[in-house]
Amino acid sequence: MLHLAGQDSRTLARRAGISLEDARRITGAVIGRGAPLRDARNVRRSVLDEVDALATPGELRLLESVDAKDGFRKYLFELPDGLRVETVRIPLYDTHHVVCLSSQAGCALGCAFCATAKLGLDRSLRSWEMVSQLLAVRADSERPITGVVFMGQGEPFLNYDEVLAAAYALCDPAGARIDARRISISTAGVVPMIRRYTAEGHKFRLCISLNAAMPWKRRALMPVEQGFPLDELVEAIREHAALRGRVTLEYVMISGVNVGEEDAAALGRLLAGIPVRLNPIAVNDASGRYRPPDEDEWNAFRDALARELPGTPVVRRYSGGQDEHAACGMLASRRRGD
């Protein structure tokens, strides 16, 4: 896949100095159909030559794909420099798919419950490497792909410009044609970039990984709390909600750690008056250090949330793909059996 696959048609037109119409035709070929540049229709050869001269050859190599029992499919890709990343295809309603993309090879944030954190950070992905994950999964899918979540390996807001470039390439009507409202970008709470994202007015859904409402507890789970404290994060959430609408807060539930009555009460105090959606999800920890709550613990936590955050949507996310380590928090860039 060429470097230009990571650009939307307007960016391509500006950088290549070509007409927007030609850029749309090229985007339609490379991203819309997953075809080579030379297969762009109704574009003069001289224009293709100009664009080709700007493109950097490179491709993602599919090393392996494995199917979980519940229909999730995990892909292991090798990047041009030999690094590996994983991508997950998520089935929805037996009619379409959502794709979970990685934005970095590894991650530097060190969240205690996440397998990717144990890898450390090798590098950030380029926009075309993220778009190419989607194109490879699409080529392997009979059902349409109608949504994208930047929730795979890495911290998207520590690769801000490339992630936004990929998101705009994916929602380009000339390319992948994914509704921008169905593209979600998740962050562990990089406050300056949240504020920049809010100020710039992007149309994608913002998701923030919260996981605890007490600073000391969040710091133990997420070292990012040391650099971007909870009070600053909540102010950034409040600002975004006021200007751009409801924020989705992800909450990894860990038995005996963050699902007690006191945790629900702390969430109620922290989020009072802020329009948010809370998405709890059970922890997935292959190491066995952390356990998900059982049904009684979840039910008690849910009821406590209803009391402490009346009117706040609380939607429990399904934790799929566990048997093949395709679930949230389990991506470790390994082949099956490694």
From Swiss-Prot:
BP terms from Gene Ontology: rRNA base methylation; tRNA methylation
Matching PROSITE patterns: RADICAL_SAM
Residues reported to bind S-adenosyl-L-methionine: 154-155, 186, 209-211
Lineage: Bacteria, Pseudomonadati, Myxococcota, Myxococcia, Myxococcales
Binding site for [4Fe-4S] cluster: 107, 111, 114
Intrachain disulfide bonds: 100-328
Subcellular location: Cytoplasm
Keyword Iron in record: yes
Listed InterPro entries: Aldolase_TIM (IPR013785), Methyltransferase_A (IPR040072), rRNA_lsu_MTrfase_RlmN/Cfr (IPR004383), rSAM (IPR007197)
GO molecular function term, any single one: RNA methyltransferase activity
Protein name: Probable RNA methyltransferase Adeh_4229
Residues at the catalytic site: 86 (proton acceptor), 328 (s-methylcysteine intermediate)
Pfam families noted in UniProt: Radical_SAM (PF04055)
Signal peptide: none
Cofactor detail note: Binds 1 [4Fe-4S] cluster. The cluster is coordinated with 3 cysteines and an exchangeable S-adenosyl-L-methionine.
UniProt GO cellular component terms: cytoplasm
Family: Belongs to the radical SAM superfamily. RlmN family.
Keywords of this entry: 4Fe-4S, Cytoplasm, Disulfide bond, Iron, Iron-sulfur, Metal-binding, Methyltransferase, S-adenosyl-L-methionine, Transferase
Cofactor(s) the protein requires to work: [4Fe-4S] cluster
Domain Radical SAM core per the UniProt entry, residue ranges: 93-322
